[in-house]
Amino acid sequence: MALLDKWIALDIGAYLARFYDFSTQKEIVLKTIIAQKGSEVLGVSDQAIAYLYKDLDTIQIQYPISHGQILHSIEPLIHEGLDKLHAYDGLLRPSVLVSVPSELSQRQRELWQQAFLNCGVRKIEFISNLEVLQEENPCFLVHSGHSYTEIHICAYDKVLVSKTIYYAGVQVDEQIQRIVYMKTGYFITKVDAAHLKEMASDAFWQQKNILLMCYGFDSRQNLHPIQIESSIVWPAIEMVSSQISLWVKHCFDTLPASLQEYFLMHGIELSGGMADCFGPSQLISQNISCPVLCTKRGQYDMIDALKGVKSA
C-alpha cells in the first residue's frame, strides 16, 4: 500500500454497511437504510429508523442494496461512513477496497464505481467474496448474508463449485412479516422483522421460548404494540435454513468420494449474518452429518477478512 494512500475497507450489505480505516484501525457500522422526503435526505442508518413510524405518506424509507445490487442511491450512506471515519480530513482523498458478490455483473460494478467517484473517492478496488474467503487448503465455504447465500467449494487449485442462491436473512424477515400479519392482523417493518429474528434466534440458542415485543400497523396505518412468542418465528427460520441446507447438500453430492470424506472430517465453514442465526448450521450438519464451523462474528466476517488484505 502506498504511503500516500488513505485506504478504507468497505463491506456494504443489504442490512449493514461496514467501514474500516486501515491507518487508524477504526471501524464504523451503519444500517443500510435511508430516509428521504422528495430529493432531501432526512437521515441514514439509525437516524433513518427514527422515521419508520412517522409521516408515512410523505417520507420514503429506502433499503438501497439487495443481492449486492444498487436499487437506490447509496451516496448518502457512503458519505456518512467516510465522514464518521474522518476520511475527508486532510489533503488526501480516500481510496476504497470494496467486497462485492462473486457473481456481480460488470454493469453493477460500474454503478458502484460511479457512486464512489461521486463521493470524492480517489481510487476504487473491488474484491469478490470468494477471493476474500478462499483458503490454500481444500475448503467448503457457505457465506450466507442478508439477501443471498454463496456456496463455494475449492480444491486442487480450482473452484469446483460456485453457486449463489437467494435464500438468506431477508427471506426469513419476509416470512416473519407474513407470520405476524397472519397471527395479529398487523404489518411490521423490515427492521422490526429483522429484530424479531435476532431475538428469537438468541432464545433458540439458549433453548428458551421467550416473549417478543414490537409495533405493527393496522390498515389505517395506526401503530399497535405486538407480543408474540419466539416459537412462532421458528417456521420462518426453519424454511429458509432448510433451503440453504438442501442446496449445500446438493453441492456436496456433486463431489468425488475422496473430497466428500475430506469435508466430512474437516467440516463446512459457515460465515455471514446467518452464521449467527440458530438454524442453518444445525440443519446443514443434520443433512450432511458433518461438522459446521461457524465464524465468531458472522455479520462482520467480510470486513474482518478485508483487514488482512492490505496493511497500513
Where on the chain are the PLM-derived regions?
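Nucleotide/phosphate-binding catalytic cleft detector across ATP-hydrolyzing
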Residues: 1-42, 46-144, 154-268, 275-301, ...
